[in-house]
Amino acid sequence: MTHYIFDMDGTLFQTNAVLAHALEDVFHDLRQAGQWEGETPLALYQQIMGVSLPEVWATLLPEFSLAEQQAADRQFRRSLEQAVEAGHGQLYPGTVELLARLKQAGHPVYIASNGWPSYLSAIVSTYGLATYIDHVYSIEDIASGDKSALVREICQMHDITSGYVV
């Protein structure tokens, strides 16, 4: 049996629309508090997308303390989930049809993502994906925070010997 492990952001879900919204929220508030001048660094974020959120904030806010970076991260997470739940994002064309075909053919489908669990859950529930996905795994499910290790763990847990990582 062939198994499929998909990434969520940038593979199934078009993240840019919700990212821009959430980043704008964070940097708007930083500007209001006098902690940031200039535009929201969306282009820089898009260049590093896929790294862990602590790495994101260390890159976007290098002069900020760890506590300030963590506060920005909490606000970003809240804003991102709200944007997803409000329908500001979208799946790539054909996503639901592909997942439905795979499921109908009996192929197990998993998600392995750098996203955190509540964010991934918001996408799955908002866009009706639960029917097609056997399990959603977050980078937070593995102590190392390494996505390759997460995929290896999924393969071991489900005794996967044949499949695709997309």
Functional labels for PLM-detected ranges:
Residues 116-165:
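Substrate-recognition "cap/lid" segment bordering the active-site pocket of phosphatases
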Residues 82-111, 121, 148-152:
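Short, acidic loop-to-helix structural element flanking the phosphoryl-transfer center
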Residues 11, 113-115:
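Conserved phosphate-coupling serine/threonine residues in phosphotransfer and NTP-handling enzymes
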